[in-house]
Amino acid sequence: MQPLMGFFIAALRYEITGELDVWTKMLVIVKTSMLNGCAYCIGHNTTLGRALGMTDEQTHALEGDYRNSDLFSAADKAAIAWAECLTERHYHRDKTTMADLKEHFNDTQVLEITMVSGFFNFWNRFNDAMELDIVNRFKKSTELDPEDYVAYMRSCWWNAEDTMDGYQAKAAE
């Protein structure tokens, strides 16, 4: 099961490119994880966010009043607000959040933002229910060089003998 879950996580973060940039995906992942209170996901994803350039100030703003922060663009704020809306399940009552999102993102990007937040709502609950130990993976991610982000993500989920490159090579045959 780990390779399958790893595939989904890597795909939603980076491996399978869509129209949505990795920065926006990471903002959505971190905000969703914060709202769900999943210690494993918060620790791991804020560290990965740092590797992408997320500052401590931005992390704190995500926890607090990001809407009035000058640390995020209007598009960032719209994506964060939509993740919040999905996680807190008030999207049926809040049509303005979707309208704001569509001012900054096309339909494909809106779909990607929704998929990322939706998946991490599941993943946060799964990790909380399984009471995963954060120590080993978190320790590994704190030593992450931003240049090695993709290599790190691959190393988290596939066995050494069955790397993503190996899967890609087999698929090309």
PLM region spans:
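Hydrophobic alpha-helical segments
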Residues: 1-173
